[in-house]
Amino acid sequence: YFCTVGMSVYNIHKKPVSVPNVGKVTLTELLNSKKYGKIYIMLGINEVGYKFSNTIEKYSELIEFVKSKQSDAVIFIQANLHVTKSRSDSDKVVNNTAINGLNAELAKLADGKSKFYLDANILFDDKTGGLSSNKSEDSTHLYAKYYSEWGKWIIRQTASLIGEG
């Protein structure tokens, strides 16, 4: 996993990240280190306050960069998860209207051939369309106990889209 707190499409190339069983590497070094069959990208929640067109341009550039390093890899663009209705209703920046707008633009980056869009919000949303309040302590982040369910869902979706797990 190439991830760190605060990572965004604006800073993903800027500093090395500690990757389990690999060490501290930049994204370029990681992508050059071996051939990947599938690459899952989930960025955007830290960008919700930025102008969407700039964020989507940077996201598109990131996908093209990844494709240039891993031309045979299938890329899965993951939707940003919603926040709870209470957080959404009280936050002018990080709210479900903004998240849905960003996710809609991210979905357009998928081509259904080598780039696919995955939206796991159906797993965790309540009837209001926000993150279920019983699945988050801070109204923003999913409890870790749901990660396994999320991972299994991703495997099923991957199999459904490209015929393998």
Regions found by a protein language model. Give the residues of each.
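Conserved SGNH/GDSL esterase-like catalytic core that processes O-acyl groups on lipids
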Residues: 1-61
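Structural signal for conserved beta-strand scaffold positions within catalytic alpha/beta enzyme cores
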Residues: 1-4, 77, 119
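N-terminal cationic-hydrophobic initiation segments that often serve targeting/anchoring roles
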Residues: 31, 66-68, 107-110
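Structural beta-sheet core signal
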Residues: 41, 76-77
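Residue-level signal for short, function-critical loop segments
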Residues: 45, 79-81
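Generic structural signal for well-ordered alpha-helices
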Residues: 59-64, 103
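A short helix->loop->beta-strand "cap" motif at the edges of active sites that frequently abuts
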Residues: 70-74
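Catalytic His-Asp segment of secreted/periplasmic serine-dependent ester chemistry enzymes
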Residues: 82-165
